[in-house]
Regions:
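Beta-rich carbohydrate-recognition and catalytic domains
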Residues: 1-69, 75-168
Length: 168
């Protein structure tokens, strides 16, 4: 860990607190975020923490050349019965030329991510700082995010956390 930003804390289904954080190397600038930190606490005072370094974990894949993994957040996925960690991601080799939203599921002890990042949302231009909430009144997930190119806060909705592109 070189510095932390964008902390997101979630009180879990089991009463524990889960935090996902951008692992930022501040002295190296905005494109120095090669991973994220997963943290877990029973009391908000004592934390177990684990860094997920994408170039190491995903060596040989399109995710090995990340320049930034930004603003991770966590939400419980009732269908998968796991914590979903979602984040904005961009690479320096053109494979992912602008910030797009991806997700992975955290493993059982919240110390690592399972599998490769899966595409969550792409507006066709850079999107960052996604926040997803479930609204029981309309039975929809609402995703709010910043559009880097057009400015402002945008919103998308879905019936499930991992709805196919374009599906409500």
């Amino acid at each position: 860990m070189g510095g932390l930003r964008d902390p997101h804390i979630l009180r879990g289904e089991d009463g524990w607190f889960y935090m996902a954080v951008t692992d930022m190397k501040c002295a190296l600038g905005w494109n120095s975020n090669r991973g994220l930190v997963l943290m877990k606490s029973k009391d908000l005072i004592h934390w177990d923490h684990h860094t997920v370094h994408f170039p190491t974990k995903y060596a040989g894949t399109q995710f090995a050349n990340v320049t930034r993994v930004w603003a991770p957040e966590t939400i419980w996925d009732p269908q998968a019965k796991k914590y979903m960690v979602y984040f904005s991601l961009r690479t320096n080799d053109g494979a992912i030329p602008y910030d797009k939203d991806y997700y992975c599921y955290a493993n059982a002890d919240f110390s690592d991510l399972e599998g490769e990042p899966t595409y969550l949302y792409d507006r066709g231009s850079a999107t960052i700082d996604m926040d997803i909430v479930y609204n029981e009144a309309d039975s929809l997930y609402h995703g709010f995010f910043k559009n880097e190119d057009l400015g402002g806060i945008c919103k998308v909705t879905a019936r499930t956390l991992t709805a196919p592109e374009g599906a409500p």
